[in-house]
UniProtKB/Swiss-Prot annotation:
Source organism of this protein record: Saccharomyces cerevisiae (strain ATCC 204508 / S288c) (Baker's yeast)
PANTHER family: TRANSCRIPTION INITIATION FACTOR IIE SUBUNIT BETA, TRANSCRIPTION INITIATION FACTOR IIE, BETA SUBUNIT
Annotated gene: TFA2
Protein name: Transcription initiation factor IIE subunit beta
Keyword Phosphoprotein set for record: yes
One matching Pfam family: TFA2_E-tether
Major localization listed first in the record, in broad terms: nucleus
Record has Nucleus as a keyword: yes
Region (Disordered): 32-105
Length: 328
């Protein structure tokens, strides 16, 4: 068979003309042990080779040795040949091995495609969350174009349709705006005072519910408290507002210092003396005087020790006593 008519040689030459990568070392034969080329010995000291040393050695080998290609012919095929290139370079250290390409139609390709589908779904949910938070923080109607610019979306994005289906988001088709429906529609000091005046009970308004539609309400609450217009219950740890009430009693700082000191100097009796003090003043205490309660002492039963009866034997008188049991 001539060289021009050899199909294997023709495929090899065509493959060489297309491939312009680094030289590839042929795979080791079956049964041949793989040498550890990652370890070198210099002056009796053994250490791992660096990536630069290995790259330099590969360059020298490519200049000395030809490219070895292993061509495997597929069984039962007369027209196609499979060309396999096996890289024998060990890249365990430094993580310098190149990333492997995923073959189309393989299991890895299907897993990658499924993963990309999940990422696209999660990306839509993330954009929906960002849009909701943006509308909530604004505290006022937001234009659709403003929301699209903020999220870098197009007008036909499906996130817009998902926003219209949310219960806490109101869409105005005439104005083209989105509005967050908070627990209390309060966004100014006057609206807060109006809400507190309209309360029938003294339960108070939760600041957590106020921040649902008005995240920046802390500054307004502090200012209204300074003006003695509202009453605020704060946490003990960081003094953040918890509940607010409308102050219908006037200025909170109008009490003279003299009365404040008088109130602080009043000493309350001890808990045990409180019922007797009330009786001396002609008042009936709601609780029983602890001094009138007789203490009931529990009688402790002492168990008597039983005396154990020991065995009485006459073994020391066996020679003196006589046995008359046969006469009975």
């Amino acid at each position: 068979m001539s060289k021009n008519r050899d199909p294997l040689l023709a495929n090899l030459n065509a493959f060489k003309s297309k491939v312009k990568s680094a030289p590839v070392i042929a795979p080791a034969k079956v049964g041949q042990k793989k040498t550890n080329d990652t370890v070198i010995t210099i002056d009796g000291n053994t250490r791992k080779r660096t990536a630069s040393e290995r790259a330099q050695e590969n360059t020298l080998n490519s200049a000395k040795n030809p490219v070895l290609v292993d061509i495997k012919k597929e069984a039962g095929s007369n027209s196609s040949n499979a060309i396999s290139l096996d890289d024998d370079d060990d890249d365990e250290d430094f993580g310098s091995s190149p990333s492997k390409k995923v073959r189309p139609g393989s299991i890895a390709a299907a897993a990658l495609q499924a993963n990309q589908t999940d990422i696209s779904k999660s990306h839509d949910s993330s954009k929906l969350l960002w849009a909701t938070e943006y509308i909530q923080k604004k505290g006022k109607p937001v234009l659709v174009n403003e929301l699209l610019d903020y999220l870098s979306m197009k007008k036909d994005d499906k996130v817009i349709e998902l926003l219209k289906k949310l219960d806490r988001i109101e869409f105005d088709p005439k104005k083209g705006t989105f509005k967050y429906l908070s627990t209390y529609d309060v966004h100014s000091p006057s609206e807060l005072l109006k809400l507190l005046r309209s309360q029938v009970t003294f339960k108070g308004i939760s600041c957590k519910d106020l921040k649902d539609g008005w995240p920046q309400c802390d500054e307004t609450i502090n200012q209204l408290e300074e003006d003695s217009k509202i009453l605020v219950l704060r946490t003990k740890k960081d003094k953040t507002p918890r509940y607010v009430w409308y102050n219908s009693g006037g200025n909170l700082k109008c009490i003279d210092e003299e009365f404040v000191k008088m109130w602080e100097n009043v000493q309350l009796p001890q808990f045990a003396e409180l019922p007797r003090k009330l009786q001396d003043l002609g008042l009936k205490p709601a609780s029983v005087d602890p001094a009138t309660i007789k203490r009931q002492t529990k009688r402790v039963e002492v168990k008597k020790k039983r005396q154990r009866k020991g065995k009485i034997t006459n073994t020391h008188m066996t020679g003196i006593l006589k046995d008359y049991s046969h006469r009975v």
